[in-house]
Regions:
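Short amphipathic alpha-helix with an adjacent loop that forms part of the alpha/beta core around
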Residues: 211-223
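N-terminal Rossmann-like NAD(P) cofactor-binding module of classical short-chain dehydrogenase/reductase
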Residues: 96, 228-229, 251
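Short, charged beta-turn/beta-strand-edge "cap" motif at the junction between a beta-strand
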Residues: 39-40, 79, 99-111, 192, ...
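Mid-domain Rossmann-like dinucleotide-binding core that forms the NAD(H)/NADP(H) cofactor-binding site
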Residues: 134-209
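C-terminal hydrophobic helical "lid"/dimerization subdomain
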Residues: 1, 281-328
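NAD(P)H dinucleotide-binding glycine-rich loop of Rossmann-like/cofactor-binding domains
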Residues: 83-84, 94-164
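Glycine-rich phosphate-binding loop and adjacent beta-alpha segment
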Residues: 104, 234-294, 325-328
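Glycine-rich beta-strand-centered segment in the early N-terminal region that forms part
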Residues: 22-39, 52-101
Length: 328
């Protein structure tokens, strides 16, 4: 079968499409899935180039990708067809999901074995051409839930600033913060993406045309915001600390973020930890199905263009998600 592998850390050029990868055998609580689409995320290029802490846990050669959509083939030893059916995962069912933390096997392969609890059925009415959105949903969706609900604990009346409002995670942080009761959400992004931020329910701050710090200061009369959800971190974390209201929280999404500057100032800072559960995946199904989580896919590329996809990820200005189509 075809799969993406890399045998050393480095740039996008280390990614290779192999055509003779062995088909995996599912463990007892795993499901074998025929993959149709793979969602890509900045974490993928950070693992590939060795900068993520997860890279030290990787055995090379390794695969790439954390999330996917596809069709159930069969279950492992403890998951016969009846048991799969009781979970809504009968053979032939279209599903989406992601690798749980600690499972570093890639998803960019024609067939993968993946934990049954890390999958949820795609609604039957979803057309095939809509599957890229589902392939790109799990990681950003579960990250956003962990950031808003677990780390920031956004609640009624909170004011929220999202750094990176039109990235994959940012497009879900905004509606989830509003869903949690936020009274006002501002989101930074390029001026060209201001309308998209408005559509998501936030007030845009065009960082390429105005000073976001001055704008937040003006909009909050110098009080600052209750919560900062920071998908950028490197250029935004430290200055954000000057715009946190008393008792406020800052949530940087990069897992290697240094929280010391915040804690030294008595500001609550928490890095979200993704929890992969069927309950949370089903919440994403409802949100996407009902239009509450309008995740955008910017590009769909064939598997053979994996290096190009990683180049786009590294550029850092991707709007929405980049998805691989294994049938293209």
């Amino acid at each position: 079968m075809r799969a993406i592998v890399f045998d050393r850390f480095g740039g996008p050029e280390v990614l290779t499409v192999v055509t003779d990868a062995p088909e995996p055998e599912p463990a007892s609580e795993e499901v074998l899935v025929q993959v149709s689409h793979v969602g890509l995320n900045p974490l993928d290029h950070k693992i590939r180039d060795g900068s993520s802490r997860l890279a030290s846990q990787l055995e090379l050669p390794a695969g790439t990708g954390r999330e996917m959509a596809g069709t159930v083939i069969r279950g492992g030893a403890d998951l016969d067809d009846a048991e799969l059916g009781s979970r809504g995962l009968a053979p032939g069912t279209r599903v989406f999901g992601m690798r749980p933390p600690g499972d570093l096997r890639g998803t960019a392969a024609e067939v993968i074995a993946i934990a049954a609890d890390a999958l949820s059925p795609v609604p039957t009415e979803v057309m095939h051409e809509e599957l890229p959105r589902w392939a790109g949903l799990a990681l950003v969706g579960l990250t956003a839930i962990s950031a808003v609900d677990d780390a920031a604990k956004v609640s009624g009346g909170d004011t929220v600033l999202v750094h990176g409002g039109t990235g994959g995670v940012g497009q879900l942080l905004i509606p989830m913060a509003l869903e949690a009761g936020a009274s006002q959400v501002w989101a930074t992004g390029r001026a060209a993406n201001a309308q998209r931020i408005r559509e998501l329910g936030a007030t845009p701050i065009a960082y390429d045309e105005e000073d976001w710090e001055e704008e937040i200061d003006r909009a909050t009369a110098g009080r600052g915001v209750d919560v900062v959800l920071d998908t950028h971190y490197h250029s935004t974390f430290l200055p954000s600390l000057d715009h946190i209201a008393p008792g406020g929280r800052v949530v940087p999404l990069p897992t290697l973020a240094d929280l010391t500057p915040a804690t030294e100032r008595g500001i609550t800072a928490v890095i979200p930890e993704i929890t992969v559960t069927r309950e949370r995946l089903d919440r994403l199904v409802i949100g996407l199905r009902e239009g509450h989580y309008p995740l955008e896919v910017s590009q769909v590329l064939p598997l053979e263009q994996i290096s190009r996809a990683h180049e786009l990820l590294e550029g850092g200005h991707t709007r929405g998600k980049i998805v691989l189509d294994l049938d293209a």
